[in-house]
Amino acid sequence: MTDVYIYDTVRTPRGRGKPDGKLHEITPMQLAAQMLKSIRDRNDLDTSKVDDVIMGCVAPVGEQGADIARIATLMADYDQSVAGVQINRFCASGLEAVNMATAKVMCGQSDMAIGGGVESMSRVPMGADGGAWATDPAVAFKTYFIPQGISADLIASKWGYSRDDVDAYAIESQKRAAKSWEEKRFSNSVVGVKDVAGMTVLNHDEHMRPEATIQSLAGLKPSFEMMGNNYGFNSTALQKYPEVEKINHVHHAGNSSGIVDGASMVLVGNKYIGEAMGLKPKARIKGFAQIGSEPTIMLTGPSYAAEKALVKCGMNKSDIDLWELNEAFAAVVLRFMEELDIDHGDINVCGGAIAMGHPLGATGAMILGTA
Protein backbone atom coordinates (compact mmCIF):
# COMPACT_ATOMS: atom_id res chain seq x y z
CA MET A 1 0.00 0.00 0.00
CA THR A 2 1.00 3.61 -0.56
CA ASP A 3 2.43 5.51 2.41
CA VAL A 4 0.14 8.33 3.55
CA TYR A 5 1.34 11.51 5.23
CA ILE A 6 -0.35 14.25 7.19
CA TYR A 7 0.71 17.55 5.64
CA ASP A 8 -1.33 19.97 7.72
CA THR A 9 -4.02 20.18 10.39
CA VAL A 10 -6.19 23.17 11.23
CA ARG A 11 -9.10 23.76 13.52
CA THR A 12 -11.27 26.58 14.72
CA PRO A 13 -11.24 27.60 18.34
CA ARG A 14 -14.22 26.01 20.05
CA GLY A 15 -17.06 28.40 20.84
CA ARG A 16 -19.69 27.80 23.50
CA GLY A 17 -22.58 26.02 21.83
CA LYS A 18 -25.21 28.41 23.12
CA PRO A 19 -26.93 31.48 21.66
CA ASP A 20 -24.50 33.68 23.60
CA GLY A 21 -21.45 31.80 22.31
CA LYS A 22 -18.97 33.69 20.16
CA LEU A 23 -19.50 31.40 17.16
CA HIS A 24 -23.30 31.30 17.26
CA GLU A 25 -23.60 33.94 14.54
CA ILE A 26 -21.21 32.01 12.28
CA THR A 27 -22.96 29.38 10.17
CA PRO A 28 -21.55 25.85 9.97
CA MET A 29 -20.94 26.47 6.28
CA GLN A 30 -18.76 29.45 7.16
CA LEU A 31 -16.86 27.44 9.78
CA ALA A 32 -16.10 24.66 7.31
CA ALA A 33 -15.25 26.98 4.42
CA GLN A 34 -12.90 29.09 6.54
CA MET A 35 -10.91 26.02 7.57
CA LEU A 36 -10.71 24.85 3.95
CA LYS A 37 -9.44 28.28 2.95
CA SER A 38 -6.85 28.11 5.72
CA ILE A 39 -5.57 24.72 4.53
CA ARG A 40 -5.31 26.13 1.01
CA ASP A 41 -3.62 29.40 1.92
CA ARG A 42 -1.16 27.98 4.47
CA ASN A 43 0.12 25.47 1.94
CA ASP A 44 -0.27 27.45 -1.29
CA LEU A 45 -2.40 24.58 -2.59
CA ASP A 46 -3.41 24.08 -6.15
CA THR A 47 -6.85 22.86 -5.09
CA SER A 48 -7.39 21.03 -8.36
CA LYS A 49 -4.96 18.44 -6.94
CA VAL A 50 -7.30 17.68 -4.02
CA ASP A 51 -9.36 14.66 -5.05
CA ASP A 52 -11.94 14.68 -2.27
CA VAL A 53 -13.07 16.50 0.86
CA ILE A 54 -14.71 14.29 3.48
CA MET A 55 -16.41 15.88 6.48
CA GLY A 56 -17.94 14.37 9.56
CA CYS A 57 -21.18 15.88 10.82
CA VAL A 58 -23.42 14.24 13.43
CA ALA A 59 -26.54 16.32 12.79
CA PRO A 60 -26.50 16.65 8.97
CA VAL A 61 -29.81 18.50 8.73
CA GLY A 62 -30.88 22.10 8.29
CA GLU A 63 -27.85 24.33 7.85
CA GLN A 64 -25.62 21.25 8.05
CA GLY A 65 -27.58 19.23 5.50
CA ALA A 66 -27.37 18.68 1.73
CA ASP A 67 -23.74 17.44 1.68
CA ILE A 68 -22.10 20.32 3.52
CA ALA A 69 -18.64 19.10 2.45
CA ARG A 70 -19.22 19.62 -1.26
CA ILE A 71 -20.89 23.00 -0.80
CA ALA A 72 -18.13 24.16 1.55
CA THR A 73 -15.50 23.45 -1.12
CA LEU A 74 -17.37 25.76 -3.48
CA MET A 75 -17.76 28.44 -0.81
CA ALA A 76 -14.02 28.18 -0.12
CA ASP A 77 -13.32 28.78 -3.83
CA TYR A 78 -11.77 25.37 -4.39
CA ASP A 79 -11.57 24.10 -7.93
CA GLN A 80 -14.96 22.84 -9.10
CA SER A 81 -13.44 19.41 -9.75
CA VAL A 82 -12.99 18.79 -6.00
CA ALA A 83 -15.56 16.30 -4.76
CA GLY A 84 -17.08 16.39 -1.29
CA VAL A 85 -19.04 14.05 0.95
CA GLN A 86 -20.50 14.21 4.45
CA ILE A 87 -20.35 11.17 6.76
CA ASN A 88 -21.77 10.33 10.18
CA ARG A 89 -20.17 7.89 12.62
CA PHE A 90 -21.41 9.81 15.63
CA CYS A 91 -18.58 11.14 17.81
CA ALA A 92 -15.96 9.40 15.64
CA SER A 93 -17.13 11.20 12.49
CA GLY A 94 -14.21 13.61 12.17
CA LEU A 95 -11.64 10.88 12.70
CA GLU A 96 -13.46 8.53 10.34
CA ALA A 97 -13.44 11.26 7.69
CA VAL A 98 -9.64 11.37 7.95
CA ASN A 99 -9.53 7.56 7.88
CA MET A 100 -11.56 7.51 4.68
CA ALA A 101 -9.37 10.15 3.08
CA THR A 102 -6.33 8.13 4.13
CA ALA A 103 -7.77 4.91 2.72
CA LYS A 104 -8.29 6.55 -0.67
CA VAL A 105 -4.63 7.55 -0.78
CA MET A 106 -3.40 4.23 0.62
CA CYS A 107 -5.08 2.23 -2.11
CA GLY A 108 -3.87 4.57 -4.84
CA GLN A 109 -7.25 5.97 -5.84
CA SER A 110 -6.35 9.47 -4.65
CA ASP A 111 -3.12 11.41 -4.37
CA MET A 112 -4.37 14.04 -1.94
CA ALA A 113 -7.54 14.46 0.10
CA ILE A 114 -8.88 16.37 3.08
CA GLY A 115 -10.70 14.81 6.01
CA GLY A 116 -12.30 16.72 8.85
CA GLY A 117 -15.60 17.75 10.30
CA VAL A 118 -17.94 20.50 11.39
CA GLU A 119 -20.64 20.92 14.00
CA SER A 120 -22.51 24.06 15.02
CA MET A 121 -24.24 22.80 18.14
CA SER A 122 -25.66 26.23 18.93
CA ARG A 123 -27.47 26.39 15.58
CA VAL A 124 -28.23 22.71 14.90
CA PRO A 125 -28.78 21.10 18.30
CA MET A 126 -28.07 17.50 19.24
CA GLY A 127 -30.91 15.21 18.22
CA ALA A 128 -32.08 17.47 15.41
CA ASP A 129 -31.63 14.59 12.97
CA GLY A 130 -33.96 12.27 14.89
CA GLY A 131 -33.29 8.61 14.16
CA ALA A 132 -34.86 5.30 15.11
CA TRP A 133 -33.21 4.99 18.51
CA ALA A 134 -34.91 8.19 19.64
CA THR A 135 -38.24 7.75 17.85
CA ASP A 136 -39.00 4.03 17.47
CA PRO A 137 -39.64 2.15 20.74
CA ALA A 138 -39.31 -1.22 19.00
CA VAL A 139 -35.76 -0.39 17.94
CA ALA A 140 -34.82 1.00 21.35
CA PHE A 141 -36.27 -2.07 23.10
CA LYS A 142 -34.52 -4.62 20.89
CA THR A 143 -31.10 -2.96 21.21
CA TYR A 144 -31.34 -2.02 24.92
CA PHE A 145 -30.81 1.62 24.01
CA ILE A 146 -29.91 4.15 26.69
CA PRO A 147 -28.50 7.68 26.21
CA GLN A 148 -24.73 8.03 26.31
CA GLY A 149 -24.68 9.91 29.60
CA ILE A 150 -26.31 6.97 31.32
CA SER A 151 -23.89 4.64 29.53
CA ALA A 152 -21.07 6.65 31.09
CA ASP A 153 -22.70 6.36 34.51
CA LEU A 154 -23.05 2.61 33.89
CA ILE A 155 -19.31 2.39 33.23
CA ALA A 156 -18.61 4.26 36.45
CA SER A 157 -20.95 1.96 38.37
CA LYS A 158 -19.64 -1.26 36.85
CA TRP A 159 -15.96 -0.47 37.41
CA GLY A 160 -16.26 1.51 40.61
CA TYR A 161 -15.34 5.05 39.58
CA SER A 162 -16.60 7.43 42.24
CA ARG A 163 -17.80 11.01 41.91
CA ASP A 164 -14.44 12.11 43.31
CA ASP A 165 -12.62 10.03 40.67
CA VAL A 166 -14.43 11.57 37.71
CA ASP A 167 -14.29 15.08 39.16
CA ALA A 168 -10.54 14.78 39.75
CA TYR A 169 -10.06 13.74 36.13
CA ALA A 170 -12.11 16.72 34.96
CA ILE A 171 -10.04 19.18 37.00
CA GLU A 172 -6.85 17.79 35.49
CA SER A 173 -8.29 18.22 31.99
CA GLN A 174 -8.96 21.88 32.75
CA LYS A 175 -5.45 22.41 34.11
CA ARG A 176 -3.81 20.77 31.10
CA ALA A 177 -5.89 22.74 28.61
CA ALA A 178 -5.10 26.02 30.34
CA LYS A 179 -1.38 25.21 30.43
CA SER A 180 -1.42 24.23 26.76
CA TRP A 181 -2.92 27.58 25.79
CA GLU A 182 -0.48 29.43 28.03
CA GLU A 183 2.42 27.61 26.36
CA LYS A 184 0.95 28.26 22.88
CA ARG A 185 0.84 24.56 22.01
CA PHE A 186 -2.12 25.14 19.70
CA SER A 187 -0.66 28.15 17.90
CA ASN A 188 0.21 26.20 14.75
CA SER A 189 -3.20 24.64 14.32
CA VAL A 190 -5.88 26.98 15.69
CA VAL A 191 -7.14 29.51 13.13
CA GLY A 192 -9.28 32.39 14.36
CA VAL A 193 -12.83 32.56 13.03
CA LYS A 194 -13.97 35.71 11.25
CA ASP A 195 -17.39 37.22 10.64
CA VAL A 196 -18.71 38.37 7.27
CA ALA A 197 -16.95 41.72 7.76
CA GLY A 198 -13.60 39.99 8.16
CA MET A 199 -13.31 40.73 11.88
CA THR A 200 -12.01 37.96 14.15
CA VAL A 201 -14.77 36.90 16.53
CA LEU A 202 -12.93 34.11 18.37
CA ASN A 203 -9.29 33.05 18.58
CA HIS A 204 -9.30 30.83 21.69
CA ASP A 205 -11.29 27.93 23.12
CA GLU A 206 -14.21 29.62 24.83
CA HIS A 207 -15.51 26.73 26.93
CA MET A 208 -12.55 26.31 29.32
CA ARG A 209 -13.01 26.76 33.06
CA PRO A 210 -9.47 26.76 34.50
CA GLU A 211 -10.75 28.12 37.80
CA ALA A 212 -12.79 24.95 38.45
CA THR A 213 -11.99 23.03 41.63
CA ILE A 214 -13.11 19.79 43.23
CA GLN A 215 -15.15 21.91 45.62
CA SER A 216 -16.91 23.85 42.87
CA LEU A 217 -17.69 20.68 40.91
CA ALA A 218 -19.12 19.08 44.04
CA GLY A 219 -21.99 21.55 43.89
CA LEU A 220 -23.16 20.40 40.45
CA LYS A 221 -26.11 18.03 40.25
CA PRO A 222 -25.89 14.79 38.22
CA SER A 223 -27.09 15.41 34.68
CA PHE A 224 -28.66 12.03 33.94
CA GLU A 225 -30.24 10.88 37.21
CA MET A 226 -33.75 12.14 36.51
CA MET A 227 -33.69 10.80 32.96
CA GLY A 228 -32.48 7.41 34.14
CA ASN A 229 -35.06 7.12 36.89
CA ASN A 230 -38.09 8.61 35.17
CA TYR A 231 -37.76 7.15 31.67
CA GLY A 232 -36.70 3.61 32.47
CA PHE A 233 -33.13 3.87 31.21
CA ASN A 234 -31.64 2.78 34.54
CA SER A 235 -33.82 -0.33 34.46
CA THR A 236 -32.71 -1.08 30.90
CA ALA A 237 -29.05 -0.78 31.89
CA LEU A 238 -29.49 -3.01 34.93
CA GLN A 239 -31.40 -5.58 32.89
CA LYS A 240 -28.49 -5.77 30.47
CA TYR A 241 -25.87 -5.72 33.25
CA PRO A 242 -27.47 -7.53 36.22
CA GLU A 243 -24.12 -7.71 38.02
CA VAL A 244 -24.40 -3.96 38.64
CA GLU A 245 -26.44 -3.36 41.79
CA LYS A 246 -27.47 0.22 40.97
CA ILE A 247 -26.55 3.06 38.64
CA ASN A 248 -24.51 5.71 40.40
CA HIS A 249 -25.05 8.95 38.53
CA VAL A 250 -21.67 10.64 38.80
CA HIS A 251 -21.53 12.65 35.57
CA HIS A 252 -22.57 16.27 35.27
CA ALA A 253 -21.78 19.33 33.18
CA GLY A 254 -18.36 19.72 34.79
CA ASN A 255 -16.99 16.24 34.04
CA SER A 256 -18.63 15.68 30.66
CA SER A 257 -17.68 17.07 27.26
CA GLY A 258 -18.79 20.60 26.56
CA ILE A 259 -21.37 21.56 23.94
CA VAL A 260 -19.50 23.77 21.46
CA ASP A 261 -19.27 24.92 17.85
CA GLY A 262 -16.25 24.21 15.67
CA ALA A 263 -14.65 22.74 12.56
CA SER A 264 -11.39 21.01 11.68
CA MET A 265 -9.52 19.82 8.58
CA VAL A 266 -6.59 17.44 7.99
CA LEU A 267 -4.67 17.42 4.69
CA VAL A 268 -3.32 13.99 3.72
CA GLY A 269 -1.49 12.78 0.65
CA ASN A 270 1.16 10.49 -0.74
CA LYS A 271 4.88 11.22 -0.82
CA TYR A 272 5.00 12.15 -4.47
CA ILE A 273 2.34 14.84 -4.47
CA GLY A 274 3.81 16.28 -1.30
CA GLU A 275 7.21 16.59 -2.92
CA ALA A 276 5.72 18.03 -6.10
CA MET A 277 3.87 20.70 -4.10
CA GLY A 278 6.74 21.46 -1.74
CA LEU A 279 4.93 20.21 1.36
CA LYS A 280 6.65 18.94 4.48
CA PRO A 281 4.99 15.95 6.17
CA LYS A 282 4.11 16.24 9.85
CA ALA A 283 3.43 12.53 10.39
CA ARG A 284 2.81 9.23 8.60
CA ILE A 285 -0.41 7.31 9.09
CA LYS A 286 0.34 3.61 9.62
CA GLY A 287 -3.22 2.37 9.91
CA PHE A 288 -6.59 2.62 11.61
CA ALA A 289 -9.45 0.43 12.80
CA GLN A 290 -13.13 0.55 13.63
CA ILE A 291 -15.19 -1.66 15.91
CA GLY A 292 -18.78 -1.90 17.06
CA SER A 293 -19.28 -2.38 20.79
CA GLU A 294 -22.23 -3.56 22.88
CA PRO A 295 -24.72 -0.72 22.38
CA THR A 296 -25.99 -0.30 25.93
CA ILE A 297 -22.63 0.42 27.51
CA MET A 298 -21.18 1.46 24.12
CA LEU A 299 -18.46 3.79 25.44
CA THR A 300 -16.04 0.94 26.19
CA GLY A 301 -15.40 0.68 22.44
CA PRO A 302 -12.25 2.86 22.20
CA SER A 303 -9.96 0.33 23.90
CA TYR A 304 -11.09 -2.44 21.55
CA ALA A 305 -10.60 -0.22 18.50
CA ALA A 306 -7.14 0.79 19.72
CA GLU A 307 -6.10 -2.82 20.25
CA LYS A 308 -7.41 -3.76 16.81
CA ALA A 309 -5.47 -0.91 15.19
CA LEU A 310 -2.27 -1.92 17.00
CA VAL A 311 -2.60 -5.49 15.73
CA LYS A 312 -3.21 -4.30 12.17
CA CYS A 313 -0.09 -2.12 12.35
CA GLY A 314 2.08 -4.81 13.96
CA MET A 315 2.61 -2.61 17.02
CA ASN A 316 2.34 -2.91 20.78
CA LYS A 317 1.04 -0.48 23.38
CA SER A 318 4.62 0.19 24.41
CA ASP A 319 5.27 1.63 20.95
CA ILE A 320 2.89 4.52 21.63
CA ASP A 321 4.34 7.58 23.36
CA LEU A 322 1.20 9.73 23.50
CA TRP A 323 -2.48 8.82 23.37
CA GLU A 324 -5.48 10.99 22.52
CA LEU A 325 -9.00 9.92 23.47
CA ASN A 326 -12.12 12.01 23.25
CA GLU A 327 -13.24 13.03 26.72
CA ALA A 328 -16.93 12.42 26.11
CA PHE A 329 -17.29 11.68 29.81
CA ALA A 330 -14.60 11.31 32.46
CA ALA A 331 -15.37 7.64 33.17
CA VAL A 332 -14.76 6.77 29.52
CA VAL A 333 -11.13 7.85 29.74
CA LEU A 334 -10.66 6.27 33.17
CA ARG A 335 -11.88 2.95 31.79
CA PHE A 336 -9.67 3.25 28.69
CA MET A 337 -6.59 3.89 30.83
CA GLU A 338 -7.39 0.96 33.10
CA GLU A 339 -8.19 -1.46 30.28
CA LEU A 340 -4.98 -0.71 28.37
CA ASP A 341 -2.84 0.02 31.44
CA ILE A 342 -1.98 3.53 30.27
CA ASP A 343 -0.47 6.09 32.62
CA HIS A 344 -2.45 9.30 32.98
CA GLY A 345 0.68 11.23 32.06
CA ASP A 346 0.63 9.68 28.58
CA ILE A 347 -2.92 10.51 27.52
CA ASN A 348 -4.65 13.78 26.64
CA VAL A 349 -1.60 15.72 27.75
CA CYS A 350 -3.01 18.99 26.36
CA GLY A 351 -6.41 18.58 27.97
CA GLY A 352 -9.50 17.44 26.18
CA ALA A 353 -13.19 17.87 25.48
CA ILE A 354 -14.17 18.22 29.15
CA ALA A 355 -12.22 21.46 29.19
CA MET A 356 -12.36 22.62 25.58
CA GLY A 357 -15.58 21.08 24.32
CA HIS A 358 -16.73 18.46 21.82
CA PRO A 359 -18.13 19.73 18.50
CA LEU A 360 -19.46 16.30 17.62
CA GLY A 361 -18.55 15.88 13.95
CA ALA A 362 -15.24 17.75 14.17
CA THR A 363 -13.60 16.49 17.37
CA GLY A 364 -11.98 13.37 15.92
CA ALA A 365 -9.96 15.40 13.44
CA MET A 366 -9.20 17.99 16.13
CA ILE A 367 -7.61 15.51 18.52
CA LEU A 368 -5.68 13.89 15.67
CA GLY A 369 -4.19 17.31 15.02
CA THR A 370 -3.43 17.72 18.72
CA ALA A 371 -1.54 14.42 18.79
Question: Which residue stretches match the model-derived regions?
Answer:
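Short, well-ordered amphipathic alpha-helical segments that serve as non-catalytic structural scaffolds
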Residues: P28-D44, I68-A72, A97, G149-I155, ...
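N-terminal extracellular/periplasmic Venus flytrap/periplasmic-binding protein-like
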Residues: V10-P13, H24-Q34, R42-D44, A168-A276, ...
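Active-site-proximal alpha-helical scaffold in enzymes
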Residues: I87-V118, A156-F186, M265-Y272, E338, ...
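Conserved catalytic cysteine-centered active-site region
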Residues: C57-S110, T143-I150, A218-G258, E339-A371
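Conserved beta-strand-centric core segments of catalytic alpha/beta enzyme folds
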Residues: M1-Q34, S93, A97-D129, D136-Q148, ...
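Conserved beta-ketoacyl condensing-enzyme motif
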Residues: K22-A113, V118-A134, V190-N203, T296, ...
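Glycine- and Gly-Pro-enriched alpha-helical subdomains that act as flexible
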Residues: G269-D319, M337
